[in-house]
Amino acid sequence: MSEEKIKVSELAKEFPAVPNKDMLRALRELGASAKSMAGSLTTEEAARVREHFAEQKQADAERSGSHPNVIVRRRRKDADKADAPEVTEAAPAAREEVAPPAEEKPAAVEAPAQAEPVAEAPAASPHKVEEKAAPEAAKAEPAEKAKSSKARVVSAARVISRPGEEEEKKPEPVVESKPEPVAEISPVAAALAAREAAARAEEKSSEKGEEKGAKAARLARPDASAMPEGSSAPTLPQRAPEARTEAWKDADASAAADAAPRRAPRADGGQAPSAAPQVRIISRPAPGSQPDRSTRPAGGRPGAPGGPRGDSAGRPPRPGGPRPSGPGGPRPAGGPRPGGFGQQPAAPASPTDTRDGQSKKKRLKGRRTVDFQQGDFGGRRDDDDSQRLNRGKGRRKGGKPTSSQATQPLKAAKRKIRVTEAIRVADMAHQMGLKANEIIKVLFGLGVMATINQALDFDTATLVASEFGYEVEKAGFSEDDYLTPKEVDAPETLKPRPPVVTIMGHVDHGKTSLLDAIRKSNVTSGEAGGITQHIGAYHVKTKRGEIVFLDTPGHEAFTAMRARGAQVTDLVILVVAADDGVMEQTREAINHARAAGVPIMVAVNKMDKPSADPDRVLRELAELGLQAEEWGGDTIVAKVAAKTRMGLDDLLEMVALQSEIMELKANPDKAAKGHIVEAKLDKGRGPVATVLIQEGTLRQGDSFVCGPFSGRVRALMNDQGKKVKEAGPSLPVEVQGFEGVPEAGEEFFVVSDEKLARRIADSRAIKQRERELASESRVTLETFLSQRKSDQETLTLNLVLKSDVQGSLEAITEALLKQSTDKVRINVVHGGTGAITESDILLASASQAIIIGFNVRPTAKIKDVAEHENVDIRFYEIIYKLVDDIKSAMAGLLAPVQREVYLGQAEVRDTFSVPKIGLIAGSYVADGKIARNAGVRLLRDGVVVYTGKISSLKRFKDDAREVVKGNECGVGLENFNDVKIGDIIEAFETVEEAATL
């Protein structure tokens, strides 16, 4: 052929009505080289494709003319006489086979050899073809005319499968007796055609084998073509049975009697059984389905054109003969016929998938289609059998009925749906067994624009459910179901645990110093002003066992901290200074311990001082109800001196003895539960909380819930700053992984998974928000006027508080709010933990507030923003100084006081050790200046690490009085060597000036 090529996509434009899928299938059948729409074809291949679709188009036109109301899924052989010329053209190639196939299908003009019984005489096949192709003509004309027309059709022999195979193989008596009921076909015409076909079938009984060969060929070629030249198997799919009409059913009834005799002869012949199944196959609509039907042996198919059939002349009863005239006109192509009902196993080679795909699309359109798999063929089975087959067919083919059946039982089974506070449309549809778009339609009717992810409240869900006959149950979420233990721990699961001892007492009475002496550490020196302002938890190993100590602040502002310490402890050690006696916070600590029901031990500290008076202390304690043992009471009293370590062993001995009496036990093999001792926001690690485990074991990776926050344990660190994998009962650990900074004192629960933790946390957040909204007083005219009147008379001092830890923030807030008077009111606009940020500056500027920083410092950039916004920032490290300043400012009594003046900042870029001097910080002055006589602070991540003085300041090797911005210098700090690269050294000086507050 010529070298010219044409693209498949260009060729497809010549056939706009042909889908790409059909075009590619035709290319495969014709053996074209192109495999996709982007491929190219030779001119010869293109001509073959055009001829193929031209024949198909003509066949479709003829079929649609005779049955306009029927939709055919595959091309079929024309039953009209007009087809005869086409058939004759194709006949030469297929004629050798044609004769046998034609005989096989006297009534069902099925070309495939499998469906056709043995038919040696070619003339017989033409008659058979005519019978199918021209059923209308048969009705109007005598049987003779019908026969002659059949002869013409036979020559067309499109249906004929492989000609070679049919001749070689002896045709079995099996004749495709496809009694395709056509409404138009009259029983008489069908009977005449069937008789003639039967006679011919007898003559061709020897060609039974050909039928089988044709069947195989048909399986191999799923598509039914208009007998392309050189095609050995009929490619036309048979669809005759699908379009049944009432007339066809009548014909079936009349054919039943004749069919029985025909079947009997077949049984004698032995070939009949195979022929019978083939006849049934005729109904097969799709090429893929054809193989399936052929496979299934339909013993009752006796209607085949086989010799034995001829005697029965029952062909007429089966309307299959005239089939062509009916909607099954195209059906005459016997190709599909070989396939039995869907019941038969489909041949692997059959292209059922393609057929099914087409039929599904057409069915979805709700249009009338020809069902080739329908079970009752005229004269083939009795009415009951056909009805049963039809029912099965409907189930297989009807996608819509099946889906409705699947939904209905679900509706009937559940008439209630469960809804919490809200439910998504998708979840509601799932519970009701409906599609989401049905619910969305109802919502649109109610004026609600919703999507499948839209959440509906309980009332809306009730309205929607009522539209579908459902009731709504409110399924409230109760966290107690998950957090409250359902079973009491068995005695054998309980194991001894260390006691938790809280040290309480008045400020500066030596609580932390006593703990330092026990731990052999030096915590006090690192505390601002030498007082404790955080609650600390420490795990100590002593000669008498392990003890966990909680060190609480003694300042009056830390009432809430002391109360928390008493709640989570087993034993309270009340520290009283021998020289001071019982003070205000001592009494408060006693009340906290009694409220928590915790036993109290007394440690009389500072016994090494000359002014110590232990008897006075015992007398004052007795007045409060704490009678010492030596005075005849039951309160254990130990006399100690923290600095000289006097009496510490006796104190620990008493603690161990008391814990043994209490028999402290816990179950370590359960989900952990504990309390938040302290919480803060760390710049590098995020929200961090110190948790005291009370029962169970906390492990890395556990999901937990704490207040309105949930999280997952990312890391655990003990009181010494070392990472640990797990923590058991009575052990304090620092936990990373919170979503936010929890409130100190909150309960900490480990739950099964992160999803549950988040659900509980969200539920708590919603309830907390509802409580806040409910607590807001309703605004009335009276309350508004009274508020305005009071506002005019009262001055308000707005403050923004930033602290290093949550507990300190809480204490400062309470202490400041207590200072409010009728004339001056304190209003804390915002409080948080961590370094001062730009958003804090902007908030203070908008609310005309003063920023109070407690143990936190701003960076140089933040200072610039504050100056630009004219916001005053005050920094404090000791709470009572902060409270005193606020008091003085409120009272307007602030005479000239000392005030810090910021000098500059230097960034530590390197560190090196110098003998006899210590660690020197090689620094770069980033802002202002560093003066030799100035005070300095060492900032690490915005938090104050050290406050003191400069011991040495050098530039290169020379001492310097000051170093200005942009220069490098070496800075040595007094009594401090823990300087790290990246730290900030801030210089300041103290001056006296009038208070601006």
Swiss-Prot record:
Residues 505-512 are annotated as: G1. Pfam families: EF-G_D2, GTP_EFTU, IF-2, IF2_N. Signal peptide: none annotated. Residues 530-534 are annotated as: G2. Residues 641-643 are annotated as: G5. Residues 316-335 have a biased composition (Pro residues). One of its GO terms (molecular function) is GTPase activity. Residues 36-415 are annotated as: Disordered. SUPFAM superfamilies: Initiation factor IF2/eIF5b, domain 3, P-loop containing nucleoside triphosphate hydrolases, Translation proteins. Residues 45-65, 94-107, 127-147, 163-181, 197-214, 241-252, 378-388 have a biased composition (Basic and acidic residues). Residues 496-665 form the tr-type G domain. Its main location: cytoplasm. Residues 390-399 have a biased composition (Basic residues). Residues 300-309 have a biased composition (Gly residues). Residues 551-554 are annotated as: G3. CDD domains: IF2_eIF5B, IF2_mtIF2_II, mtIF2_IVc. Residues 605-608 are annotated as: G4. It is found in: Cytoplasm. PROSITE patterns: G_TR_2, IF2. The keyword Acyltransferase does not apply. Residues 108-126, 151-162, 182-196 have a biased composition (Low complexity). One of the essential components for the initiation of protein synthesis. Protects formylmethionyl-tRNA from spontaneous hydrolysis and promotes its binding to the 30S ribosomal subunits. Also involved in the hydrolysis of GTP during the formation of the 70S ribosomal complex. This is Translation initiation factor IF-2. It comes from Desulfovibrio desulfuricans (strain ATCC 27774 / DSM 6949 / MB). The gene is infB.
